[in-house]
Design a protein with these regions (language model features):
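Short acidic, Gly/Ser-rich segments with clustered Asp/Glu that frequently serve as metal-coordination loops
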Residues: 15-20
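…and closely analogous acidic/polar surface helices at protein-protein or active-site interfaces
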Residues: 22-39
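Von Willebrand factor
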Residues: 39-58
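Short hydrophobic beta-strand that contains or immediately precedes a catalytic carboxylate
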Residues: 10-12
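Active-site loop/turn elements of alpha/beta-hydrolase fold enzymes
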Residues: 14, 51-53, 152
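Short, flexible, mixed-charge acidic loops at enzyme active sites
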Residues: 59-66
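Active-site-adjacent betaalpha module
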Residues: 1-8, 34-42, 68-188
Length: 188
Protein backbone atom coordinates (compact mmCIF):
# COMPACT_ATOMS: atom_id res chain seq x y z
CA UNK A 1 0.00 0.00 0.00
CA UNK A 2 1.11 3.53 -0.73
CA UNK A 3 1.61 5.99 2.12
CA UNK A 4 -0.84 8.83 1.39
CA UNK A 5 1.57 11.38 2.89
CA UNK A 6 4.22 10.32 0.36
CA UNK A 7 1.95 9.87 -2.67
CA UNK A 8 0.85 12.28 -5.37
CA UNK A 9 -1.74 11.69 -8.06
CA UNK A 10 -0.93 13.56 -11.27
CA UNK A 11 -3.59 14.16 -13.90
CA UNK A 12 -1.83 14.90 -17.17
CA UNK A 13 -3.30 17.14 -19.86
CA UNK A 14 -6.96 16.64 -18.95
CA UNK A 15 -7.64 20.10 -20.34
CA UNK A 16 -10.65 21.23 -22.28
CA UNK A 17 -8.50 22.22 -25.26
CA UNK A 18 -6.99 18.75 -25.48
CA UNK A 19 -10.21 16.86 -24.85
CA UNK A 20 -11.88 18.90 -27.58
CA UNK A 21 -9.05 18.23 -30.01
CA UNK A 22 -8.22 14.54 -29.44
CA UNK A 23 -11.09 12.45 -30.80
CA UNK A 24 -12.15 9.69 -28.41
CA UNK A 25 -10.22 10.97 -25.39
CA UNK A 26 -13.38 11.70 -23.42
CA UNK A 27 -13.94 7.94 -23.11
CA UNK A 28 -11.36 7.74 -20.30
CA UNK A 29 -12.85 10.57 -18.22
CA UNK A 30 -15.00 8.25 -16.02
CA UNK A 31 -11.94 6.17 -15.08
CA UNK A 32 -9.83 9.28 -14.52
CA UNK A 33 -12.55 10.84 -12.35
CA UNK A 34 -12.82 7.62 -10.32
CA UNK A 35 -9.05 7.67 -9.69
CA UNK A 36 -9.16 11.33 -8.64
CA UNK A 37 -12.06 10.72 -6.25
CA UNK A 38 -10.17 7.81 -4.68
CA UNK A 39 -7.07 10.00 -4.29
CA UNK A 40 -9.13 12.71 -2.61
CA UNK A 41 -10.59 10.18 -0.21
CA UNK A 42 -7.12 8.81 0.60
CA UNK A 43 -5.76 12.37 0.90
CA UNK A 44 -3.05 11.99 -1.71
CA UNK A 45 -1.55 15.22 -2.98
CA UNK A 46 -3.42 15.92 -6.24
CA UNK A 47 -1.67 17.92 -8.95
CA UNK A 48 -3.17 18.74 -12.32
CA UNK A 49 -0.48 19.24 -14.96
CA UNK A 50 -1.23 20.82 -18.32
CA UNK A 51 -0.15 23.19 -21.02
CA UNK A 52 -0.12 26.87 -20.10
CA UNK A 53 1.38 29.75 -22.03
CA UNK A 54 1.58 33.50 -21.68
CA UNK A 55 -0.46 35.72 -24.01
CA UNK A 56 1.17 35.67 -27.44
CA UNK A 57 2.99 32.39 -26.68
CA UNK A 58 6.47 33.94 -26.23
CA UNK A 59 7.65 30.56 -24.88
CA UNK A 60 7.28 28.96 -28.32
CA UNK A 61 9.93 29.56 -31.01
CA UNK A 62 8.78 29.91 -34.61
CA UNK A 63 10.45 26.62 -35.66
CA UNK A 64 8.75 24.59 -32.91
CA UNK A 65 6.16 21.92 -33.79
CA UNK A 66 4.03 23.57 -31.09
CA UNK A 67 3.89 26.67 -33.31
CA UNK A 68 1.50 25.14 -35.85
CA UNK A 69 -0.84 23.50 -33.36
CA UNK A 70 -0.79 25.80 -30.37
CA UNK A 71 0.50 29.25 -31.19
CA UNK A 72 -1.24 29.68 -34.52
CA UNK A 73 -4.56 28.61 -32.97
CA UNK A 74 -4.01 30.71 -29.82
CA UNK A 75 -4.50 27.67 -27.56
CA UNK A 76 -3.64 27.05 -23.91
CA UNK A 77 -3.11 30.65 -22.84
CA UNK A 78 -3.37 30.62 -19.04
CA UNK A 79 -6.83 31.75 -17.95
CA UNK A 80 -8.56 30.86 -21.23
CA UNK A 81 -11.06 28.00 -21.72
CA UNK A 82 -8.62 25.74 -23.61
CA UNK A 83 -6.21 25.79 -20.63
CA UNK A 84 -8.92 24.87 -18.11
CA UNK A 85 -9.11 21.34 -16.74
CA UNK A 86 -12.17 19.15 -17.24
CA UNK A 87 -14.77 19.81 -14.55
CA UNK A 88 -14.99 16.18 -13.44
CA UNK A 89 -11.21 16.01 -12.91
CA UNK A 90 -10.10 19.23 -11.21
CA UNK A 91 -11.69 21.10 -8.32
CA UNK A 92 -11.10 24.73 -7.37
CA UNK A 93 -8.23 24.97 -4.92
CA UNK A 94 -6.35 21.91 -6.15
CA UNK A 95 -2.80 22.48 -7.27
CA UNK A 96 -2.26 23.20 -10.97
CA UNK A 97 1.18 23.15 -12.58
CA UNK A 98 1.58 24.46 -16.10
CA UNK A 99 4.20 23.25 -18.55
CA UNK A 100 5.31 24.54 -21.93
CA UNK A 101 6.36 21.28 -23.58
CA UNK A 102 5.25 17.62 -23.64
CA UNK A 103 6.43 16.11 -20.34
CA UNK A 104 4.95 16.99 -16.94
CA UNK A 105 8.37 18.05 -15.63
CA UNK A 106 9.08 20.35 -18.60
CA UNK A 107 9.83 24.00 -17.86
CA UNK A 108 8.11 24.20 -14.47
CA UNK A 109 8.47 23.64 -10.73
CA UNK A 110 6.84 20.19 -10.50
CA UNK A 111 9.96 18.38 -9.29
CA UNK A 112 10.62 21.04 -6.64
CA UNK A 113 7.00 20.89 -5.43
CA UNK A 114 7.06 17.09 -5.16
CA UNK A 115 10.35 17.04 -3.25
CA UNK A 116 9.26 19.89 -0.94
CA UNK A 117 6.18 17.85 -0.01
CA UNK A 118 8.13 14.65 0.58
CA UNK A 119 6.52 12.78 -2.30
CA UNK A 120 8.10 9.44 -3.22
CA UNK A 121 5.27 7.72 -5.12
CA UNK A 122 3.57 9.05 -8.25
CA UNK A 123 0.29 7.69 -9.57
CA UNK A 124 -0.62 9.18 -12.93
CA UNK A 125 -2.46 8.98 -16.22
CA UNK A 126 -2.78 11.25 -19.21
CA UNK A 127 -3.74 12.20 -22.70
CA UNK A 128 -1.88 10.94 -24.59
CA UNK A 129 -0.22 7.70 -23.59
CA UNK A 130 2.56 8.23 -26.16
CA UNK A 131 2.99 11.92 -25.29
CA UNK A 132 2.79 13.28 -21.78
CA UNK A 133 2.40 9.89 -20.08
CA UNK A 134 5.50 8.39 -21.69
CA UNK A 135 7.57 11.57 -21.20
CA UNK A 136 6.49 11.89 -17.58
CA UNK A 137 7.22 8.26 -16.76
CA UNK A 138 10.73 8.44 -18.23
CA UNK A 139 11.60 11.61 -16.30
CA UNK A 140 9.96 10.46 -13.04
CA UNK A 141 11.86 7.18 -13.19
CA UNK A 142 15.13 9.06 -13.76
CA UNK A 143 14.30 11.23 -10.73
CA UNK A 144 13.85 8.06 -8.60
CA UNK A 145 10.11 8.31 -8.03
CA UNK A 146 8.21 5.05 -7.68
CA UNK A 147 5.52 5.16 -10.34
CA UNK A 148 2.11 3.69 -11.01
CA UNK A 149 0.44 4.28 -14.38
CA UNK A 150 -3.33 3.81 -14.52
CA UNK A 151 -3.68 2.45 -18.02
CA UNK A 152 -7.45 2.70 -18.43
CA UNK A 153 -7.34 6.39 -17.51
CA UNK A 154 -4.79 7.02 -20.29
CA UNK A 155 -5.72 7.59 -23.90
CA UNK A 156 -3.84 7.51 -27.16
CA UNK A 157 -5.27 8.18 -30.60
CA UNK A 158 -3.57 4.96 -31.72
CA UNK A 159 -4.88 2.01 -29.65
CA UNK A 160 -1.97 -0.21 -30.70
CA UNK A 161 0.58 2.34 -29.47
CA UNK A 162 -1.33 2.55 -26.18
CA UNK A 163 -1.30 -1.25 -25.86
CA UNK A 164 2.42 -1.60 -26.62
CA UNK A 165 3.36 1.14 -24.17
CA UNK A 166 1.18 -0.10 -21.32
CA UNK A 167 1.95 -3.80 -21.83
CA UNK A 168 5.57 -3.81 -22.98
CA UNK A 169 7.31 -0.49 -22.31
CA UNK A 170 5.89 1.02 -19.11
CA UNK A 171 6.18 -2.12 -16.92
CA UNK A 172 9.99 -1.79 -16.96
CA UNK A 173 9.69 1.50 -15.04
CA UNK A 174 6.29 1.47 -13.36
CA UNK A 175 3.54 -0.67 -12.00
CA UNK A 176 0.79 -0.58 -14.64
CA UNK A 177 -2.75 -1.17 -13.39
CA UNK A 178 -6.35 -0.43 -14.20
CA UNK A 179 -8.05 2.09 -11.93
CA UNK A 180 -10.16 -0.65 -10.31
CA UNK A 181 -7.13 -2.89 -9.72
CA UNK A 182 -5.22 0.00 -8.17
CA UNK A 183 -8.11 0.89 -5.85
CA UNK A 184 -8.56 -2.76 -4.85
CA UNK A 185 -4.84 -3.09 -4.12
CA UNK A 186 -4.83 0.04 -1.96
CA UNK A 187 -8.02 -0.95 -0.10
CA UNK A 188 -6.85 -4.52 0.66
Amino acid sequence: KLDPARTALLTLDFQKGILGFVSGAEAVIPNAAKAVEFARRKQYQIIHVGLGFSTGHPEIPEHSPFNRRVKQNNLFVKGTPSAEFHDSIARPGELVVFKQRVGAFSENQLHLILRARGIEHLVFFGISTSGITLSTLRRAFDLDFRCVVLKDACFDADPEVHRILTEKVFPAQAKVLTVDAFIAEQEA
